[in-house]
Amino acid sequence: RRLGTAFLVITHDMKLAADLGGRTVVLYDGHVEEAGDTRALLDHPRHPYTRGLLQSAVGLNPVRDMWGIRPTTVSYTRQPHGCPFYGRCTQSLPDCAAHAPELETQPDGRLLACNRGGVLTLLECRGLRKSFGRQRVLDGIDLTLYSGEIVSLVGRSGAGKTTLARTLAGLLPLEGDGAVEFQGEAADFAALHRRLGGVQMVLQDSQAALNPRMTVRAAVEEPMRLSGCLREGAAERALEDVGLFACDSFLTRRIHALSGGQRQRVAVARALAMEPALLLADEPTSMLDPSGKANLLRMLKGLQNSRGFSMLFITHDLDSALKISDRIFRLEGGKLARLDPNDHIRVHFNGLFDAV
């Protein structure tokens, strides 16, 4: 700056780009995917590839587990005019394989090349309020969930975390002028629970959530049967996805004969069989031992990373939230506040190096 010299840095190091500031251009396969003010790109990436790079950057996320962008899911030679990121993008449409997006200027001044306008807004709620008697539990909650991210909600017991999750799932009615939109339209909760690509919920107590007299197969297939979307082999695939053997002896076992960890995985398989765009997970690990908790969280994060669904993770356990979340909010006094744990961590890292 003192010499007035332009400085062009070509790097894979996202932390270096963040430290240098200025402007950043994101390239993929020789194409500009996104370009703009560095701080704006870091705080709110609009292209799925930019977001994937930031989520993979250890220097920017010193606590979170490393999860790279998924490998390509299609075996094809990309058409000359198709989107270069199509095979790795979790929100791509068939049309993206044939038509490359134009690099267009966005309202905030950045450049973006995406046929879908960038990372999609999946769910948006405005002014959510909920009271039980004279006690106001939710007091004007505003929250936006984007496609392909994990948002964690932490707070004390009784803070209203489950109430918020059940309201977003349509299990509790909206009050006053509160509104919930799903994929840009007013949420029709009955329809969202009964279609593929909608909203599913995993409850804290799998023993209460699953009929103990049902077989494993019947429990996993039940929502698909009720929705008229049962596909051959869907139950087996869902069980294998969550690490359970989909053999006949297990499929015919009664729910009451399963261990706690197995029941919770069956509950997750039941939800994932509906291929949800949004999974609401309310304390899914609270009844598991440390090993079971770690295995279930890594399984959920792995599936989310490869399939691209969004997840709202309700938990008391901030340490677990730090490992898997893209954003974390604390619910207290009926209000949401975003947490930035990296600020605290950077302070302690700096103190550690100062002591050496």
Locations of regions flagged by a protein language model:
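P-loop NTP-binding/switch modules centered on Walker-like glycine-rich loops
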Residues: 1-63, 292-356
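Charged, flexible cofactor/metal-binding loops and thiol motifs
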Residues: 37-121, 340-356
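ABC ATPase NBD coupling module
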Residues: 40-45, 76-80, 186-200, 214, ...
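Conserved structural motif at the start of ABC-family nucleotide-binding domains
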Residues: 123, 138-140
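Conserved ABC ATPase "signature" region
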Residues: 232-249
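Conserved ABC ATPase signature
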Residues: 254-258, 262
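Catalytic Walker B motif of ABC-type/P-loop ATPase nucleotide-binding domains
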Residues: 279-282
